Regions:
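Terminal, compositionally biased segments
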Residues: 1-9, 78-86, 93, 149-168
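Alpha-helical bundle segments that constitute or directly flank the non-heme di-iron/ferroxidase center
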Residues: 6-37, 103-126
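Amphipathic, non-membrane alpha-helical segments in soluble helical-bundle scaffolds
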Residues: 8-19, 42-49, 70-77, 98-112, ...
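Alpha-helical transition-metal enzyme core signature, strongest for iron centers
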Residues: 15-29, 45-59, 80-87, 108-115, ...
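Inter-helical turn/loop segments and adjacent helix faces that build the functional surface
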Residues: 31-43, 66-67, 122-138
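Long, hydrophobic, amphipathic alpha-helical segments used as structural scaffolds
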Residues: 33, 60-63, 67, 91, ...
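Carboxylate-rich helix-loop segments that flank metal/cofactor sites and access channels
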Residues: 66-98
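Preference for long, well-ordered alpha-helical segments
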Residues: 108-168
């Protein structure tokens, strides 16, 4: 089932907001991992990017189990917004800057925080729903916590590198 962004119950809107954010987040994570390949950041970002894609697939599975249609328009707009975000000035004319890295890792961290809240909300409202049998919400919550723990040192280091550097 495909929905067109209008109406819907709160659960449908909530899950569609999260799947749209997860789509943008997966794209951002892939880009951050590619931009940092071969650096101290690269392997962690690659692992987190893989997990974010798995988490998005888990969310789509949850939506299907709960008979919630995916709002393709909302998802496409979020994906497009992530792509447009690449056009933001980052302190240097060409290439990848320390500020780009910081902002990407911060955005990933915020996304992981939102995903953690999503899984907790689903556990508290639908944790015993037989339609979600086989979906390990506790595992998804733990994975979000793990992602947060792995991203935080990268975010701190990226902030030190980007914000201590003086341009001009």
């Amino acid at each position: 089932m495909i929905v067109l962004g209008l109406g819907g119950d709160h659960l449908s809107i909530y899950l569609n907001d999260h799947v749209a954010a997860a789509t943008a987040g997966a794209s951002l994570a892939r880009r951050a991992a590619a931009s940092n390949k071969g650096t101290d950041y690269g392997s962690v970002l690659e692992a987190v990017a893989n997990e974010i894609e798995e988490d998005r697939a888990a969310l789509v599975d949850v939506m299907q189990r709960l008979s919630v249609g995916q709002d393709r328009l909302k998802t496409a707009l979020a994906w497009g917004a992530e792509k447009a975000g690449r056009l933001k000035l980052n302190g240097q004319l060409l290439g990848y800057s320390p500020l780009s890295r910081l902002e990407e890792i911060e955005a990933l961290s915020l996304g992981v925080e939102g995903k953690h809240a999503l899984w907790q909300a689903l556990r508290s409202t639908h944790g015993t729903d037989p339609r979600l049998a086989g979906v390990d919400l506790d595992d998804l919550i733990d994975r979000a916590r793990s992602q947060r723990r792995r991203l935080e040192p990268l975010r701190t280091r990226a902030a030190e590198e980007a914000l201590r550097q003086r341009s001009g």
